[in-house]
Amino acid sequence: MSKLVIVESPAKAKNIKGYLGKGYDVVASMGHVRDLPAARLSVDIAHDFAPKYAVIAGKENFVKDLKKKAQAADYVYLATDPDREGEAISWHLATLLGLDMNEKNRVTFNEITKHGVLTGMEHPRAIDIDFVNAQQARRILDRLIGYKLSPFISQKIRRGLSAGRVQSVALRLVVDREEEIRAFKPEEYWSIDAKFTNPPERKSFAAALAGKVDDKAKIKITSKEESDKILSDLEGAEYIVQSVKKGTRKKSPTPPFITSTLQQEASRRLSFQAKRTMKAAQELYEGVEVAGHGTLGLITYMRTDSLRISEEARAAGNAFITETYGEKYLPKKPRYFKSKSNIQDGHEAIRPTTPSITPEMVKGSVTTDQYKIYKLVWERFIASLMENCLQETMKIEIVANGYVFNATGYTVKFDGFTVLYEEKGDDGKTEGAAPLPPVKAGDKLRLKSILGNQHFTQPPARYTDCLLYKSPSPREGAT
């Protein structure tokens, strides 16, 4: 019995063919085979916005050959990517090939490994027409907005300008932010910053003026004159530790990546634009040759909003953590992350397909971009399974001539997941530890320096790739 399997890319076709073996002909569609013709609107507005599709120019011979292959095969499987676009491509292929839409010939692979491919082939289903319609709605909106607004913008503003369903909204965000920046009026403020030692300790630590002893409100200094007045009040003052408060806090790991968070973190850490990130991720998903392991997909499908991971993947990750770091780095109860309630949960978060294959093991087999993205995905996934970081916090309150200074810091008591990975902020920096020296109430401190520092309030930052991806996607929590 001959079986035809249609996927999207040649690399994916080659790898899947290797897992399926004889009896399967695996061909690549090279993406979409039908689309709305560019020469006209191709949407019948008067008849419920019906789209008018045509075979993409240059693919006529491919479609002709594909029809012959489908007619000769005993069964046809549609194995395009597991997202809206992939579902739509399968629907277009089924339409062109005359396949029964109710037949279970649609298969999806969350990962391009032998296990992932064979599991997908064991669970065929009918084409999800709701998923197809979601893609069609987006495509029709793209066409309506682009074709209706672009000529107007080109005529009224500048020749060659265009509008789009996504780009116009993004442009609005950028313009609104720019208007905020232009309207912003900076306000002057000052801080009083000091450095102390606690003899015989030589290492100094920093503290900032917080307020007055008899006034719990935070002090606000708006001019150099006010700053100089406070510095004058503190001349010759004795600095005494009034209180030392200690506590503990737990720092939890962030979830494994979804599409938007992968793009954000790659932008922060690697200065990658989204296109570059997704290109490398697509290649890692479709499969690469890894020395000692053959050809395999290194990560799961990279277009996802789900934070779910399979129990098999969790077990494999836990085994790696136990073997590499020890059992104390595994939490007593497994950690589960909650996805947003309105997402498609058909596949998992972005994770390594084989957690035991470390980034260093693939470094010599993949491109630089592929290595960097795999390292991000692998570290984030493994860290998400690990124990919390435990920190001891300390707050020192120092009094002098009626003024109060505060110093805060922490020491790491157990590094937990941070032994492997820490998420960076929008400035590309991780939180730095600032341990404080041992002090107790009543200790007299030695002043090393004290300065008044001028500052100005800052306007909102202009959008970077990272901030633009982040704006519509609030972070999800864990349980």
Segments the model singles out, each with a brief description of its role:
Residues M1-L467:
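Toprim catalytic domain recognition across nucleic-acid enzymes
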